[in-house]
Swiss-Prot record:
Cellular component annotations (GO), alphabetically ordered: nucleus
Domain RRM, chain residue ranges per copy: 173-248, 270-346
Ranges of biased composition (kind: Polar residues): 31-41
Domain of life: Eukaryota
Name under which the protein is recorded: Polyadenylate-binding protein-interacting protein 11
Stretch list, region Disordered: 1-45, 136-164
Amino acid sequence: MAVVETGAAATAADAGGVVIQPPPSSPPSSMTSQDSGVSSDDQNHHSRIDQVLRHDQGLYSKIGSHVARSDGVDGGESFKRDMRELQELFSKLNPMAEEFVPPSLNKQGGNGVNGGFFTSAGSFFRNNGFAGTGNGGYGNENGGFRRKKSFGQGKRRMNARTSMAQREDVIRRTVYVSDLDQQVTEEQLAGLFVSCGQVVDCRICGDPNSVLRFAFIEFTDEEGAMTALNLSGTMLGFYPVKVLPSKTAIAPVNPTFLPRTEDEREMCARTIYCTNIDKKVTQSDVKIFFESFCGEVYRLRLLGDYQHSTRIAFVEFVMAESAIAALNCSGVVLGSLPIRVSPSKTPVRPRSPRHPMH
């Protein structure tokens, strides 16, 4: 049961407050006997509401404004004016703003840190409505939940997505060519596919399980790669090649290893790249193997590490014909593994002499 009085009390009610006046001690003569009879329950109800209003007025006074809730007009107008000012102040706040946490408190758990608060029951509530346990729940050891990703992490993720998109674009522009004759060079292979579009890169690889080889050809656009599929079945050397869309991109070569001069390009023509070499095989074993089948070896570099189960080698022959003959050794077992031989993209440069340490 709520009775709203007119005048100043009604003005305060319009401003958002509900003002209840207690019944007069002696009812006016215009009231009926039914109106004058107020039960003790109603009086108790009015008394409780008055206590709430007095408590509300005390809280309002604490935030810096004194409101006189009296029967005078000034008190109601003052309350209404203060409420308008308070509403104007609240309207200027940004509801999307995040809570500022000083660096000294950012590493500590506690009330209000990381945009949440602890209840008396020990539960931790975030501003987004998610609840966890007071000791951190699914969060970190500091009692807070995982922080938002930093700008650096977001930038790295963006770079990773960009890199992945670029890689997928390269794959769509690349074709896979199989059943390549051992005598076919990369120049001859690129010359066949140049009619389909501009060739960006051409890479021939050895197959240890076959005397034939395979290759990857990258074009400047997808149209070139699509046109290249029509060349499947074309005779190149002594075998018809198979052309399929590639599932991988050509692995880039470190540009610092590429030939820099005409002499180094001539060295590449005499050099082969050998992979899948048994770790028990020594450098002398590799040299003896290729000299027995192909010709004199001028320089050899055997490389390996503890992370890979096999090793690789760059073998430079005295004659370019020996390097071509070495391509036929792909698939031959050396030690306990079949080796893979392909033309080298890089020359075997002599090691620079080390300066003595003083």
